[in-house]
Amino acid sequence: MNTQPNKLKLSLYNTLTRQKEIFEPAEPDRVTMYVCGPTVYNRSHIGNARPAVVFDVLARLLRRLYRHVVYARNITDIEDKIIAAAKEAGVDISVITEKYARIYREDMGALGVLAPDIEPKATESIAEMISMMERLIASGNAYAAEGHVLFNVPSFAEYGRLSGRDRDDMIAGARVEVAPYKKDPADFVLWKPSTPEQPGWDSPWGRGRPGWHIECSAMIEKHLGETIDIHGGGIDLQFPHHENELAQSSCAHGHTPLARFWLHNGFVNMGSEKMSKSLGNVLLVHELLAQAPGEAVRLALLNAHYRQPLDWSDEGLAQAKRMLDRLYGALRALSDVKAEPTNDAAPDAFMEALADDLNTPKALAVLFDLAKRANTETDPGTKAQLKAALIGAGRLLGVLEMDPEAWFAGAGAASHIDGEEVERLIAARNAARKAKDFAEADRIRGALAEMGVAIEDGPQGTSWRVAS
């Protein structure tokens, strides 16, 4: 019934080649993946959450297909915005970075995002950054000037290949300041001097701190090697960040590629507008978690294909919540059978959808087909298979990991509904029915409906859920 992992071909859209390609790791049965993580100076917004959720699903799928997966997602803990936030608060930058790194982990955990295998901090790899810069200077791909180290863009003929931009677009798009010490307007900073009150490290070019782009190149080299299988991140990082990473690493490693596959998720938009602080339409993850279960926020992010822009809305989040109600309702309908989901429990059609460039909308359609069958199936053996398939498929998406009753009574219940009060009213209704006071039983059912609660009477008692 189910596809064997070693027979399933994973196809991924490679930004570098502008096409879908069959993915095979460089080393058989071992995959290396790096995803750009947060710059920790503020709370995470829904745009930060999208790559975390998307690449969490990819990591789950890779672990299903390959024996050994090494997934690294970094923490950028030295950057001008962090320095500014620390100065404004009158504290050391470590106070800011540790606080917001912790909040980021908590928020992502609430969305069901598993911790990466490696979570390197930029400040832990300063020595590796300096070593890489020294190599780039020695090869003529970088130069020192007035306490800065800059990458010599004209020295790398392939610069612009990842983003597909021409030279003028790249300079304008990066908003590169044409400082007098630059040999070329497109050259970008690898190292910059620090003032006495700014954080800094000693280097051959004086006390200073790294530029953003060199950080990821050095962390990848340190933890995963010169060439990795997959490099991921948001489409906003494609240029200049990823373009610069590619250039630095390629030149530092004798023109070997930094990554064999480059994957980028699309923007999160607020209606027809791009989400941005200047427009005042940024949605913070912790605010969304006060409105809906983390699992619903996660499903709303997976409801669109990862490469497409995602138009975020309250209705989209409410729809994701209703979808989970249906799926958990199907699991509740299967509560009378036991099933132990195995690694191959997810059905072929579901696995094929995920293996087709992580097509989560198509995979969800398969999940809902299973749920529809679960609600009408009567054969115990088939019901057990359906239950295993639902849980096994849900596990790959990072959903359906709760007990259905816990979902409807707790996480899945609307925040305004008092679960204890619902249970008290159901007990009173049951007592009224037992006493044959059907008018009172109907009155209580109506009161529950007004609260937004639907009840279902079954052979094992009365269950309830939030009404759709």
From Swiss-Prot:
EC numbers, comma separated: 6.1.1.16
Cofactor: Zn(2+)
Cellular localisation: Cytoplasm
ATP-binding among keywords: yes
Protein's GO biological process: cysteinyl-tRNA aminoacylation
Motif 'KMSKS' region per UniProt: ranges: 274-278
Comment on bound cofactor: Binds 1 zinc ion per subunit.
Annotated ATP binding sites: 277
Keyword Phosphoprotein: no
Pfam family, one: CysS_C
One term under GO cellular component: cytosol
Position of sequence motif 'HIGH' region: 38-48
Entry's family note: Belongs to the class-I aminoacyl-tRNA synthetase family.
Protein name as catalogued: Cysteine--tRNA ligase
Organism per entry: Parvibaculum lavamentivorans (strain DS-1 / DSM 13023 / NCIMB 13966)
Gene name for this UniProt entry: cysS
